[in-house]
Every structure is written in C-alpha cells, then in structure tokens.
Amino acid sequence: MRRSDRVRLDDAVALRPEKFGALAYSYRDRQLFFIDQRLLPFVDSAGARQVGEIADELVASGELQEAAVPKLLTVLEGLRRKGVVHVVI
C-alpha cells in the first residue's frame, strides 16, 4: 500500500466497535477480522483522505509512532488483499 492511496471499507463488510478497535465481518465469505484501534482511522475513512495524510496526522498527535507506519501500510495491504478494504481510484 502506498501513502498516496485512499481506502474504503468494502460494501459487504460491517464494523462493530470494540474496546480494542473493531470487529470487521465480511458478509460475502463470513470471515471475521480484528481491527486494531490504530487501524480504525484508515479503515473508516471512506476513501476521503490519503492513508499517508491520516498517518502523518496520527504521528503529529502522538497516537502513532513514525516507525509503525510501514507496518500499518503492510497490514492495510493485507486487508485489501482479503477484500476488507478497497483502494479508491
């Protein structure tokens, strides 16, 4: 996943808020995913903002360390491959 990508939740996926972040359930293939609270701003952005912009904002506010951003992008790419999120073009 690139910092310039914008992502949105797949139409067949529902989020349920939890203490740790959220549960994402895919109605398409009945898979359940645990979404860490640090991923919620990216997954729940509806494609309105670039993932790099969201990451920069979280780093500036102290909610995320800069060193964690590459790992987060890798996790987002994994969620894209599994159909949880899609890159908005």
Predicted regions and their residues:
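Long, low-complexity, charged/polar intrinsically disordered regions in eukaryotic proteins
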Residues: 1-30
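Long, charge-rich, low-complexity alpha-helical segments
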Residues: 28-89
